[in-house]
Curated annotation (Swiss-Prot):
This is Homogentisate 1,2-dioxygenase. One of its GO terms (molecular function) is iron ion binding. It catalyses: homogentisate + O2 = 4-maleylacetoacetate + H(+). The lineage of its organism: Bacteria, Pseudomonadati, Pseudomonadota, Alphaproteobacteria, Hyphomicrobiales. It comes from Rhizobium etli (strain CIAT 652). Homogentisate binds at Y364, H385.
Length: 453
């Protein structure tokens, strides 16, 4: 028996100790909560053991190439047709979907925000999502959105699935228990989790703090996968064995519940009389996973110069243009800086890609002041960015001995599409009006005469 969860609660430490995972990225897994619940040798028996129903969940067209073909077979207490009734319109006004061209008065520019403050009212995860940027078009399955979340209440009898895209969740403050229909994941800051498109889940709080905060990348396009390593070879970066998929778990609950759906940018809700998280066994390769960012094995320059930040890519969602991502998930983890005769922080840059950044903890080496844990920044396509004046002076004059950049974890959602700012983000009280001043100290040093200045 792998794992059975009935009415899993947020504060159940014993249950947390029992959570189990299966290692690997994109594997064809199999798992059962009750012995004999998983059929052997076929997918759809005439009658399933325990009176379960067989159901397929497809994450790709049937005819997708084998390398990108994704599906899982679920064996559940009720088929999913019993998990929805007649829908009513629902409203989550701060969760926006591309294309979204909100009207606001904030002009184009480099932007940075302090953390969103804890809510004064009671909010669950769905109610706590705030969209910062959108890019592309969800109805054509292109682009992404960058969200922040802040909440303080469990989704006890509320459940959700997103038909518009997969959700990459990045906790910053407070651990989460993510209960999906295919299993349970405990996810803490410096870990991430991914919930595939269309998969039912709810999120519970874990821990004793008063608010939970983090970031979400909603990927409308091709699903996240591991980037190619090229000349790096067979190892390093995010290794497949470090991705963890939950074993089967189910919630056997007969009471009024609400199922919320996001579909083409609109929200709907329906009421049912039981929990939809009723998968007792499953097998396949379309599944949620978690990943500990601290297991990322960085590579870098070991003699001189600063390499491109693409070497820090954890996951990439590709497009038809090779090497051009719908969205990349990139981190800036602890690492040694050893390059000689080199300006070691990230260099000044203008980019075809648009960059949304967040900081989970510590300091970011290009912005030691002003960019704080829980904060955000946005540098859209072709807008210049780079180290602030303080970081430049410090790095330009530092003794170039080996230095470990430690106790830090920043990340970036980077997309080929321009990221449109929402009205909420443009008017957010934590927007730093003085952000551009961080570069004011970068004065002219050129005087026409040769030599280091």
């Amino acid at each position: 028996m792998d794992q059975t969860s009935i009415q899993a609660s947020s504060g159940d430490a014993a249950a947390a100790d029992q959570l189990k995972y299966m290692p690997g990225f994109g594997n064809d897994f199999e798992t059962e909560s009750l012995p004999g619940a998983l059929p052997q040798g076929q997918n759809s028996p005439q009658k399933c053991n325990y009176g379960l129903y067989a159901e397929q969940l497809s994450g790709s067209p049937f005819t997708a190439p084998r390398g990108t073909n994704e599906r899982s077979w679920l064996y559940r207490i009720r088929p999913s047709v019993r998990h929805t009734r007649r829908f009513s319109n629902a409203s989550y006004p701060l969760w926006k979907t591309a294309p979204c061209l909100d009207e606001h008065s904030l002009p184009l520019g480099q932007l940075r925000w302090d953390p969103i403050p804890p809510p004064e009212e009671r909010l669950n995860f769905l109610e706590g999502v705030r969209t910062i940027t959108t890019a592309g078009d969800a109805t054509t399955q292109v682009g992404m959105s960058a969200h922040a979340y802040v909440f303080n209440e469990d989704m006890v009898d509320d459940y959700f699935f997103n038909a518009d895209g997969e959700l990459l969740i990045v906790p910053q403050l407070g651990a989460l228990r993510v209960f999906t229909e295919m299993g349970i994941m405990d996810v803490e800051p410096s870990e991430i989790c991914l919930v595939p498109r269309g998969m039912m889940f709810k999120i519970l709080t874990s821990g004793k703090q008063t608010a939970w905060r983090g970031y979400i990348c909603e990927n409308y396009g091709a699903k996240f996968t591991l980037p190619e390593r090229g000349p790096i070879g067979a190892n390093c970066l995010a290794n497949p064995r470090d991705f963890k998929t939950p074993v089967a778990a189910y919630e056997d609950k007969e009471k009024p519940c609400r199922v919320h759906v996001k579909w083409c940018g609109k929200f709907y809700v329906t009421e049912i009389g039981h929990s939809p998280l009723d998968v007792v066994a499953w097998h396949g390769n379309y599944a949620p996973f978690k990943y500990d960012l601290r297991t990322f094995s960085p590579v870098g320059a070991i003699l001189f110069d600063h390499p491109d930040p693409s070497i820090f890519s954890v996951l990439t969602a590709p497009t038809e243009d090779a090497g051009t991502a719908n969205v990349d998930f990139v981190i800036f983890p602890p690492r040694w800086l050893v390059a000689e005769h080199t300006f070691r922080p990230p260099w000044y840059h203008r980019n075809i890609m648009s960059e949304f950044m967040g900081l989970i903890h510590g300091q970011y080496d290009a912005k030691e002041e002003g960019f704080v844990p829980g904060g955000m920044s946005l540098h859209n396509m072709m807008l210049p960015h780079g180290p602030d004046a303080l970081a430049f002076e410090k790095a330009a004059n530092a003794e170039l001995k080996p230095v470990k950049l430690d106790h830090t974890m920043a990340f970036m959602f980077e997309t080929r599409y321009p990221q449109q700012l929402t009205k909420y983000a443009a008017e957010l009280e934590t927007l730093q009006d003085d952000y551009l001043e961080c570069w004011d100290g970068l004065e002219r040093k050129f005087d026409g005469n040769p030599g280091i200045k």
